[in-house]
């Protein structure tokens, strides 16, 4: 394999200047998603986008199946009788709920699920009898509905979240449930690593935790414009839901005890984060393991006399790659120029492009271009499969490395309100000294003019031996670093 062109990746100026406008352009031009459906916050997955989504769903399913989770499917309707039982939960979600206001002649009051804790617990009560039935780990990938009143954005802020993976687990005690929380964090790390996403892990402040949770752990990523996006959450629910639904089990000592539960979710926001994180002004770059098409072959010929032999050679190349288990497509459209095809497939994020022309046929070689760097390589047909496998690994490693470098460069610390404000204006995630007091935390985020992500769990959250004061409540000694950012 011979390098014949050095790296010259596309710029990111347009993406950084107006990320949402760029994202709309990408979804439209790359034929991933259509935003023109006439209901606010509800969008259409196009065939190419659906193929990408299916690969992500397969990753999510595999990651859960391998760790003892079982897939289920619950109805979209939740009786209000169930939904209204957990007081914190209904207070947190009531403003976002879609109500079924009429259904034939029946007057039953129903909710379109915003999340499924109140749907699943009544059934778990019927299934769990004694400690031998636990732990129980369930998950489903479904649509959930939120009556968003804020501005909606494709994949990012929706009224119908159509790829909501929610896991719900039931345990004998807090210790086992919190062990499950830690496992859920590891599952999510594996998923996001395969998506080549960099992430922060933050314990949400109490005022921003999931409604009905004891605590919430969130995965946040930083997008190229400096705003953060929540891409996954893990909740320890304690006995808040099992108490109101009377989910108990017979313990080994013969006593009946309340079960402890967790829940954790991922949605199509993770796909949005992947498309944007790996995007540039020419389109996006898809991680090879998730790309609908891993290799696109572009035959280059001039005139009818070259076409037959070059296309025949392209099909030979395709056969070799397909037999090696790769997802391959030949673009032999006669009405499009090679340059147009290069632009089109770069836009759609195909990781590798293989060019074959008359000279390549004569030399029994191909030219391979990496989408992430635009480096070109001449590769002999005999080493083609190994070269493509190696380049796909290299592309994946490079996407992951770039994402982590970008994220780490965004996180800074500030010990004054003015310094924190300046960092936010520069598109940074800023860590500021905080006492842990909720009122002080709310005041602090308002002083800085940012959102609170919470206390970092991926680094030392303690201020250590430094005598730092809470930036909002100077009379209180700081105990933690509190992460702040602008976020979607």
Swiss-Prot record:
Pfam families: HGTP_anticodon, ProRS-C_1, tRNA-synt_2b
A Gene Ontology biological process term: prolyl-tRNA aminoacylation
Subcellular location as annotated: Cytoplasm
PROSITE patterns: AA_TRNA_LIGASE_II
Gene Ontology CC terms: aminoacyl-tRNA synthetase multienzyme complex; cytoplasm
GO molecular function terms attached to this record: ATP binding; proline-tRNA ligase activity
Keywords, alphabetical: Aminoacyl-tRNA synthetase, ATP-binding, Cytoplasm, Ligase, Nucleotide-binding, Protein biosynthesis
Sequence similarity: Belongs to the class-II aminoacyl-tRNA synthetase family. ProS type 3 subfamily.
Entry's free-text remark on domains: Consists of three domains: the N-terminal catalytic domain, the anticodon-binding domain and the C-terminal extension.
Subunit structure and binding partners: Homodimer.
Known function: Catalyzes the attachment of proline to tRNA(Pro) in a two-step reaction: proline is first activated by ATP to form Pro-AMP and then transferred to the acceptor end of tRNA(Pro).
Name of the molecule in the record: Proline--tRNA ligase
Source taxonomy: Archaea, Thermoproteota, Thermoprotei, Thermoproteales, Thermoproteaceae
Gene designation: proS
């Amino acid at each position: 394999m011979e390098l014949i062109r050095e790296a010259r990746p596309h710029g990111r100026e347009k993406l950084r200047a107006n990320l949402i406008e760029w994202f709309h352009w990408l979804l439209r031009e790359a034929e991933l998603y259509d935003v023109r459906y006439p209901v606010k916050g509800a969008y259409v997955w196009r065939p190419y986008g659906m193929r990408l989504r299916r690969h992500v769903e397969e990753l999510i399913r595999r990651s859960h199946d391998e760790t003892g989770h079982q897939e289920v499917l619950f109805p979209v309707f939740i009786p209000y009788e169930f939904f209204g039982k957990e007081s914190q939960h209904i207070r947190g979600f009531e403003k976002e709920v879609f109500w079924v206001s009429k259904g034939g002649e029946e007057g039953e009051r129903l909710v379109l699920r915003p999340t499924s804790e109140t749907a699943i617990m009544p059934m778990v009560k019927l299934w769990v009898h004694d400690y031998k039935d636990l732990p129980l780990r369930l998950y489903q990938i479904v649509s959930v509905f939120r009556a968003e009143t804020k501005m909606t954005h494709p994949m990012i802020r929706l009224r119908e979240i159509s790829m909501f993976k929610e896991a719900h687990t039931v345990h004998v005690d807090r210790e086992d449930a919190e062990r499950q929380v830690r496992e859920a964090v590891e599952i999510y790390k594996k998923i996001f690593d395969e998506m080549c996403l960099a992430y922060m892990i933050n314990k949400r402040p109490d005022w921003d935790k999931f409604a009905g949770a004891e605590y919430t752990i969130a995965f946040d990523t930083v997008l190229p414009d400096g705003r953060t996006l929540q891409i996954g959450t893990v909740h320890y629910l304690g006995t808040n839901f099992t108490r109101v639904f009377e989910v108990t089990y017979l313990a080994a000592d013969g006593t009946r005890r309340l079960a402890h539960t967790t829940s954790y979710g991922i949605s199509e926001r993770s796909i949005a984060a992947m498309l944007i994180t790996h995007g540039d002004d020419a389109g996006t770059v898809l991680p090879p393991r998730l790309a609908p098409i891993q290799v696109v072959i572009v035959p280059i010929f001039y005139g009818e006399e070259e076409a037959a032999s070059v296309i025949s050679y392209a099909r030979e190349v395709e056969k070799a790659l397909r037999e090696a288990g790769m997802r391959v497509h030949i673009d032999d459209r006669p009405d499009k120029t090679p340059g147009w095809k290069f632009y089109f497939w770069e836009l759609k994020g195909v990781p590798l492009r293989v060019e074959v022309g008359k000279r390549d046929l004569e030399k029994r070689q191909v030219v391979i271009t990496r989408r992430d760097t635009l480096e070109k390589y001449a590769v002999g047909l005999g080493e083609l499969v190994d070269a493509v496998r190696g380049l796909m690994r290299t592309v994946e490693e490079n996407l992951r490395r770039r994402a982590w470098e970008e994220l780490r460069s965004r996180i800074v610390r500030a010990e004054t309100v003015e310094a924190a404000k300046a960092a936010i204006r520069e598109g940074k995630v800023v860590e500021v000294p905080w006492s842990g007091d909720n009122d002080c935390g709310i005041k602090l985020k308002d002083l800085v003019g940012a959102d609170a992500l919470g206390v970092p769990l991926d680094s030392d959250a303690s201020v250590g031996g430094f005598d730092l004061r809470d930036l909002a409540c100077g009379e209180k000694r700081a105990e933690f670093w509190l992460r702040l950012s602008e976020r979607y």
